[in-house]
Amino acid sequence: MPDFLGHAENPLREEEWARLNETVIQVARRSLVGRRILDIYGPLGAGVQTVPYDEFQGVSPGAVDIVGEQETAMVFTDARKFKTIPIIYKDFLLHWRDIEAARTHNMPLDVSAAAGAAALCAQQEDELIFYGDARLGYEGLMTANGRLTVPLGDWTSPGGGFQAIVEATRKLNEQGHFGPYAVVLSPRLYSQLHRIYEKTGVLEIETIRQLASDGVYQSNRLRGESGVVVSTGRENMDLAVSMDMVAAYLGASRMNHPFRVLEALLLRIKHPDAICTLEGAGATERR
């Protein structure tokens, strides 16, 4: 364990520390949505503070030739920046009496506070992935400059959601992004897809899954009635992770024991036109 995660005065026994960290990991896996549609770049190491942030050009097909002399349009970095990887964190407290009671009565240590901190960190990670952070200068999938948009349409009518997502995949296809596609929707829109699609006897969401083979998900971080369709793959976007979600001990305070759940990561958008947001009838086609 790195020294900065567990100080020498850490009060937990080895099995208690393992239980705490396993709880953090389980909650993160259950809660995170953005990672389900993104490739991971890393972990790079907790000391890595910056990462290249490239935007690429070149989506024309590869060449076919006998001797390999035919010229092709090269995939190249159109713009390169270096961005600082932000830290996402949430603190929690374990009371010394709870630790002693668990040991005295030979009971598992209650790590509910760690689970709560991990869930809140997971929510903030998805917030960063979908909306970025304007104060720190980070873009998200819903706010990226150069993304495509389509009108949301009327999802209260059967087939309305399916038609909107068909239109989004069509626009992505026109930009040279042929999938596989993934869809993330706000809970309100997601719930409206659980109805029989016309006279097929099939739920509308199942019809959409045939278009979006990388999954159809809901996220409570998406606001109001909104959604996003992406062409997945690290050639289009990925999540640069320097440190994955883990617990650290902060040192004793008034006999009690504060801990921190933390991670360090950054969404890297390489092809903004591999993203198509569903933003309502007044949305502009491209930003």
From Swiss-Prot:
Tell me what turns on expression of this protein. Answer: Part of the MXAN_3553-MXAN_3554-MXAN_3555-encA operon. Expression is induced by amino acid starvation (at protein level). Not present in spores (at protein level).
Q: Which UniProt keywords apply?
A: Encapsulin nanocompartment, Ion transport, Iron, Iron storage, Iron transport, Transport
**A Pfam family the protein falls into:** Linocin_M18
Family label: Belongs to the encapsulin family. Family 1 subfamily.
Entry function: Shell component of a type 1, iron-storage encapsulin nanocompartment. Encapsulin nanocompartments are 32 nm in diameter with an iron- and phosphorus-rich core (4Fe:1P) about 24 nm in diameter. Upon expression in E.coli most particles are 32 nm, 20% are 18 nm. The core is filled with an average of 14 dense granules, 5-6 nm in diameter that are not evenly distributed. Each nanocompartment is estimated to hold 30,000-35,000 Fe atoms. The minor proteins EncB, EncC and EncD probably lie against the interior face of the nanocompartment.
What NCBIfam families does this protein map onto? encap_f1 (NF041155)
Q: How does it assemble?
A: The 32 nm encapsulin nanocompartment is formed by 180 subunits; monomers form pentamers which assemble to form shells. There are 36 pores where the pentamers meet as well as 3-fold axis channels and dimer channels. The N-terminus of the protein is inside the shell.
Protein name, as recorded: Type 1 encapsulin shell protein EncA
What gene is this protein translated from?
encA
